[in-house]
Amino acid sequence: MSHRHQLKAALLVALLAFMGMAFSSAAQTNASPRQPLRLEEVLGSITNQYPPLLAALIERDITAGRLKSAQGTFDFNTFARVFGMPAGYYETATVDTGFEQFLGLWGSTVFGGYRITGGDLLPDYDKTRTQGGGELRFGLKVPLLRDGSIDRRRAAVLKAGLDKELADPVIARQQLDFIRAGTVGYVNWLGAGERWRLAERLLSIANDRHNAISNQVQAGLVGRIVLTDNLRLVVSREIFLVQAQRRFEAAALALSLFYRNTSDEPVIAARERLPDTFPMMTAPDGIQLDRDLQLAVAKRPEVRQIRLALDKLEVDRRLAQNQMLPNLDVGAFASQNFGKDRYPDLNEFELQLGVEFRMPLQRREARGRLTELEGQIQQVTNQERFARNRIHTEVRDTFSALLAAHQQIQQAQLNVELAEELRSAEEEKFRRGGSDLLPLQLREQAAFDAQLLTVEARTEYLRALADYRAATATDLAARGPLPAR
């Protein structure tokens, strides 16, 4: 029976060693020099190499492309055409070139061109005829009411510009989420590593005692059942060690999604890169909470995102209000012929002025659009107010969680001190023969559980700190602007 248990224990230890060697080899393949891995290194990797964040940065290029496309409404347009009658009573050919430029200044448009007609003399009613040197023309059209202060083309440019600004808070929101997730991944890796260390220490205690009990059994001081009981304890602690190692490996793999090398490949952080201790954990400052409540609304990207959405709706509302007005357009057109006088009626400088008025009587399209936009603006305004309330709530809630986590650390440390005192007393009593193995095992397990609670309390504090920093958008200001893609 004892030999069978010893064989199982040996196999379990061999399996554990093989798993550790395999994982360590994979980690060594990817890891950087054996310096402790710090959170700042992980966050730097997220900022510069995390694929989802790099993909989010492309939104800047997308919105810049949309803005440039919208600005195409201000492109300088030119045209050229040739037409004629090669056969017929009048054999003529005409070359006509011109340009048109939308200025954007109160919706005005300038246009002009040059035309020349050659061939047989044309009758007076032919509008394409020119003198021998051709005709220069120039014109201007200005909308006085509708499409004056704003029109669909200028509204599209304004909204595309706002979309370009909107890319930054959208990216910043994702950056906050990625930083928080990467921080939690790092904290879980720290906690899993500390659990692994504790499991090894607990197993080492049982192994050392196993050797001592074996000597006592051989000397006839204790029964073999005591050795069997301790062997059972060794096996159970080896099982826990395997579980702790697997937990660490899972945490390292999860962290590797955020932590990458210069080739943008995931790095599996080896156990050797674990820091000796957890980061310093200070008590939350209630005065800082008051400051953070004020700053969070200003720094959180959701508020700016909603404000920009409101600005876009305001552009649409301005356009809808303008579309309620009638069309009242004025224009001027001037032309002058040059060269050989073939037509006596085309010698003079010509200037044409005109006014055009148009208006749909019901104006239902503009009225309906205006009603729709006013409703949407009210919706987004309510969303903005709720977003501010939610930000305040999140900051207070995460601060409360941070405060509770810090208090748990203090209580957990006291729990460890008391459990260690009891374990030490029970161990001394066992050495003197005043106690058997079972009470000592219970004291050791209680001390181990207390240490695990401390690890959990510390990791919970760091997770709560990550939540608080995300709620207050602290990492956005701390890390500065994102790099260009």
Task: Outline where the language-model segments fall.
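Small/polar, glycine/serine/threonine/aspartate-rich low-complexity segments that form flexible
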Residues: 29-34, 79-142, 273-286, 317-318, ...
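Periplasmic alpha-helical coiled-coil/stalk elements that build and connect Gram-negative outer-membrane
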Residues: 2, 9, 168-292, 401, ...
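N-terminal cofactor/phosphate-binding cores enriched in small/glycine residues
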Residues: 35-87, 91, 98-101
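Bacterial N-terminal signal peptides
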Residues: 10-22
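Gram-negative outer-membrane assembly/targeting C-terminal domains
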Residues: 28, 463-485
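Amphipathic alpha-helical coiled-coil scaffold segments and their short linker/junction regions
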Residues: 46-47, 222, 226-227, 261-330, ...
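A short glycine-centered flexible hinge/capping loop motif at secondary-structure junctions
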Residues: 217-224, 430-434, 471
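Sec/SRP-type N-terminal targeting helices
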Residues: 54-58, 62, 71-72, 104-133, ...
